[in-house]
Amino acid sequence: MAGLYFHIPFCKRICAYCDFYKSVRLEQMDGVTAAMHRELDERQDYLRGEAVTTRYFGGGTPSLYAPAALKGLLNHAAQLFDCSGAAETTLEANPDDLTGDYLAGLREAGIDRLSIGIQSFDDDCLKLMNRRHTAAQAIGAVRAAQRAGFGNITADLIFGIPGFGGDSLKRSLDGVLSLGVQHISAYHLTVEPDTAFGRRAARGEFRAVDEEVSEEEFLTVHDTLTAAGFEHYEVSNYALPGFRARHNASYWHGTKYLGIGPAAHSFDGEERHWNASSVEKYIAGAPAGKEVLTRRDRFNEYVMTALRTVEGIDLEEAAARFGAKRLARMQEEAAPFLRSGTLRIARGRMALPPEKFLVSDAVIGALFET
């Protein structure tokens, strides 16, 4: 079982919060597409013997790609890998790209799940984030996707934006729930240095919300979405029954995945590979970076990903994979969190209750082996 990821780095406009690798040089799209086909051929042995169960186009803005280009990549991959049992093929999309004709083309290309970057239903907030669309366009995009036959749609929201909590956040939550999507990703804003928000913060013109506001907004999101029937199954992810994100689960559960495209990462459980974060270098065939994970690295990776999910750490599995001594040390470090209720042990698993996910980074850091 494995996942296949395609990174489409191109954007028409750079969002104020985004620190993913991206490029506005749309004239290079054809060159990157050709290089992605080349990389598929070069790395066909990476997934040999594996069944590809999920495929994902992320970015960037993958919805800038024509359906024919997406279909070409999927067909090429199917010639090299066993994709016959692929249960989920996702495309990240901006609302203003999703016309009726484009959506029909996506369906014909084999896309069966859309991840729509709504972020907010407040137009002033969207302007602050330098998003291309309006709230009305977001609503229209989801409705158009549903009319086109998409029955598995996830919508992205961002909270923790200074000045846009309270009623603004409530409008966004009510708005997304009114659309009848099956999955919602709600991310807390992180102000990264190499972003427009980060540069404004360095000049004293922008300040992240404080911890009290973060917790209040996190709980507002959690309480509102779970009350509407969504399961809070990972730090930033909520799903109706049967609609968890299968591809993202490959990251959280250590499943092997191959990343194709500029800045794409691959992981096989023991080694991590990453492509050049440069369109020009990628097109030129720059070699991938590589890191061989030590046993300690693999343990920390397991702790980090497992504690982001509602299932948490399987204590028996952890002992078998990493040794009883390592597990005992981790449980010693976990004792204060268990006493406070931040961590719980039930049915052989140690996990954070979803309402405590906001502090997961602090807990994970404390349990790391240094």
Language-model features: locations:
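A short, conserved structural fragment
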Residues: L338-G348
